[in-house]
Regions:
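Phosphate-handling active-site elements
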Residues: 97-99, 119-136, 161, 217-228, ...
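Acidic/histidine-rich catalytic neighborhood of metal-dependent amide-processing enzymes
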Residues: 109-185, 262-263
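Midchain, well-structured core segments that form catalytic/ion-binding scaffolds
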Residues: 156-310
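Buried hydrophobic positions in well-ordered alpha/beta secondary-structure cores of metabolic enzymes
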Residues: 21, 61, 72-75, 116, ...
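Active-site metal-coordination/substrate-binding segment of hydrolases
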Residues: 67-136, 386, 392, 397
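N-terminal helical capping/dimerization or prosegment-like subdomains
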Residues: 2-84, 287-291, 302-308, 394
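An extended, acidic, His-containing surface patch that forms the Zn2+-binding/catalytic region
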Residues: 42, 48, 81, 223-274, ...
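Structural helix-boundary/capping segments
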Residues: 132, 136-138, 143, 186-187, ...
Length: 416
């Protein structure tokens, strides 16, 4: 690739990507994928389009041959902007004000996508010239609703196979994510007996049974949490993540401590999210149900948690899994993690591992045995927020770290 102004290129790519509306739902990525394909094509790199769900194409490019293989990944879809009147600038403007680029997805993760695009473009000719090793770029759909038409499908299809991966979700330039909590969403169903509301003793109120089931489930989770022992590197990462949220809570005056966040990040969280029950106010309801969201830290088996809830609520509520995925992490001594750490130190900062409380596409890569590190520009606390932005400085710093780590992965001198 010809010499480029890294700063200007990253700003222009990020702003242009923000301007392409990829809100999910519906998560349509045809325009974004065409833009990415054309941009890489203008540099001489061909792309493959993989579309598993109509309107949600994924872009894949690869150069080189043989091992080792490194995957660079970013997702194209974003969450809805919410009330647009609460934005200082239009959410799809990609407005550049000083060091900040504003817009929905600036942090999560059009900025990260711009970084992996440019890293691929800069490193590709060097990998080709080295004669061995494969560099894979993937811009994927559907992450904000589970990644089923994106990374999950590409992994199942054998398109994304490698020896290591970097997923450019927002971490901030001096932090990197080694793992994430697993998902354990359950449906609790309470059944009763209908009767006229004026004589409730003739019926059995399913809503009241469900209330008892919710309280029981919470006690079960609290007891379950008392027996959790995290791996040492996960414990450190949980504390670092807690520090991020603790600082933000302090800024907002929420009265939450570092220990409050450490406890919830390092244990099973409990959030009754959706409740339904009854059909008419003057009837004793015979059916009520809850959708319960729990997040499980690395080192904990969701199957054991589900069994504990089922056993504890037997006779009170039925328990059905809605969506379950295992927690996952990449050990800190993995080569790709060490390379990211080295890259951060080269910029004069001390690298800090964290874990994510939510899920990323990294879980599908780790499930296939691919050591994966989450590393990209932007602050976690800005993702999905009004006036979401990414700083230009963060874009440039994460680009330099990722370019260094990726080149050293192939034993190529870093061009940066």
């Amino acid at each position: 690739m010809a010499t480029v102004n890294v700063r200007d290129t990253l700003v222009n790519l990020t702003s242009r990507l923000i301007q392409i509306n990829t809100v999910n739902p519906p998560g349509l990525t045809s325009e974004a994928s065409s833009f990415i394909k054309d941009w890489l094509g203008s540099l001489g790199y061909s792309c493959e389009i993989r579309e598993y769900v109509k309107g949600k194409p994924n872009v894949v490019a690869r150069v080189g041959k043989g091992s080792p293989t490194l995957i660079l990944n970013g997702h194209m879809d974003v969450v809805p902007p919410g009330d647009e009147s609460r934005w200082s600038y239009p959410p799809f403007s990609g407005k550049v004000i000083g060091d900040r680029i504003y817009g929905r997805g600036a942090t999560d993760m059009k900025g990260g996508l711009a970084v992996v695009m440019l890293v691929f473009a800069e490193l590709a000719p060097l990998v080709e010239g080295a004669g061995s090793g494969t560099l894979v770029f993937s811009a994927t759909a559907d992450e904000e609703v589970g990644g089923h038409a994106g990374v999950e499908a590409l992994v199942k299809d054998g398109v994304l196979v490698g020896d290591a991966a970097i997923v450019a979700e927002p971490t901030g330039f001096n932090r990197y994510c080694i793992g994430e909590k697993g998902l354990c969403q359950l449906r609790l169903i309470a059944r009763g007996r209908p009767a006229h509301g004026s004589l409730p003793i003739l019926g059995e109120n399913a809503i009241l049974k469900l209330v008892k089931a919710i309280e029981g489930a919470q006690r079960i989770v609290e007891e379950f949490n008392r027996n959790i022992k995290l791996p040492p590197d996960v414990e450190e990462a949980a504390l670092n993540a807690a520090s991020i949220y603790g600082q933000e809570a302090s800024r907002r005056g929420l009265g939450l401590s570092l220990e409050d966040f450490r406890r919830v990040i390092g244990s099973v969280s409990f959030n009754p999210g959706v409740i339904r029950g009854g059909s008419k106010v003057n009837m004793v309801p015979d059916h009520a149900e809850l959708e319960l969201d729990m997040r499980v830290p690395p080192g904990v088996d969701p199957a054991g948690l589900i069994e504990a809830v089922k056993s504890g609520l037997r006779g009170l509520a039925e328990v059905e899994p809605i969506d379950v995925s295992s927690p996952n992490y990449t050990p800190r001594d993995s080569p790709i993690v060490r390379l990211i750490e080295d890259g951060i130190r080269r910029l004069g900062a001390e690298p800090k591992p964290i874990i994510m409380t939510g899920a990323t596409d990294g879980r599908y890569l780790r499930a296939r045995g691919i050591p994966t590190v989450i590393y990209g520009p932007g602050e976690l606390t800005l993702a999905h927020a009004y006036d979401e932005y990414v700083t230009v400085n963060d874009l440039v710093n994460t680009y330099n770290v990722m370019l260094y780590a990726s080149s050293r992965f192939f034993n190529i001198p870093s061009p940066g």
